[in-house]
């Protein structure tokens, strides 16, 4: 039996523009995403000789095939046609649930990276990200990490210059808002005005290119998404 360890890093949406609905029921997005240091810890025992198991230290998280980490392991092993002779996945949660920080997607991406490394990296990071798109919209970015422009429903990830080292203040209230509910409210409001912080905002992208955290922050004001809930 071999035990694998991998960090599952959360993400923030530095910008988020919802461009419209798609025929498949998803929404087309344009977002600058950023990996941050908040993370879940993933341990994977490969070759346990037992049926698959998944354990998580946070209540309310699925511990069966409904968990994205489980789905990622199965999809990866089916893709490379490997039988691991039993897998146990252990997840130590630190990413707040229902925070929009891609906790489940980050876990799935970490499983993809860990298993790919274990089997000698038969898939490139781009192929892993493409595989992740079948699991969840945030999985491709969470597989690649860093700073990136993410488009489509999340399957198109274009790396940008890395943000400078800086601190983000993250305030997670006691309540949570589900992503499907957020998009449903957006559709109900029929918001047609797009924020100025999308790709056509030169100050924001110039700020990223010169790695200026303060300039990046100032270029994102005002924040347009608040009117969805008013």
Question: What are the language-model segments listed below?
Answer:
Residues 1-99, 117-126, 163, 172-175:
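ATP-binding N-lobe of GHMP and related small-molecule kinases
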Residues 144, 149-230:
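Conserved, helical-rich catalytic subdomain that frames metal- and/or nucleotide-binding sites
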Residues 68-72, 131, 215, 219:
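Amphipathic alpha-helical interaction/coupling elements
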Residues 49-62, 111, 208-217:
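Short, basic/glycine-rich phosphate-binding loops at helix/coil junctions
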Residues 82-154:
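Gly/Ser-rich oxyanion-binding loop with an adjacent helix/lid
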């Amino acid at each position: 039996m071999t035990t694998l360890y991998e960090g599952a890093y959360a993400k923030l949406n530095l910008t988020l523009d919802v461009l419209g609905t798609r025929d498949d029921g998803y929404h087309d997005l344009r977002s600058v995403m950023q990996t941050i240091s908040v993370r879940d810890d993933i341990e994977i025992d490969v070759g346990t000789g037992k049926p698959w198991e998944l354990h998580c230290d946070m209540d309310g998280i699925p511990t069966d095939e409904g968990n994205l980490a489980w789905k990622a392991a199965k999809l990866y092993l089916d893709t490379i046609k490997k039988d691991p002779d039993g897998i146990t996945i252990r997840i130590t949660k630190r990413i707040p649930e229902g925070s929009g920080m891609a906790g489940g997607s980050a876990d799935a991406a970490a499983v993809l990276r860990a298993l790919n490394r274990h089997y000698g990296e038969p898939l490139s990071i781009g192929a892993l990200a493409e595989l992740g798109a079948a699991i969840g919209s945030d999985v491709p970015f969470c597989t690649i990490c860093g700073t990136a422009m993410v488009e489509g429903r999340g399957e198109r990830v274009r790396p940008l210059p890395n943000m400078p080292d800086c601190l983000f203040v993250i305030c997670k209230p006691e309540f949570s808002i589900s992503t499907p509910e957020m998009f449903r409210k957006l559709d109900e409001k029929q918001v047609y005005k797009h924020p100025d912080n999308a790709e056509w905002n030169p100050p924001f992208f110039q700020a990223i290119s010169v790695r200026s955290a303060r300039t990046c922050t100032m270029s994102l004001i005002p924040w347009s998404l608040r009117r969805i809930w008013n």
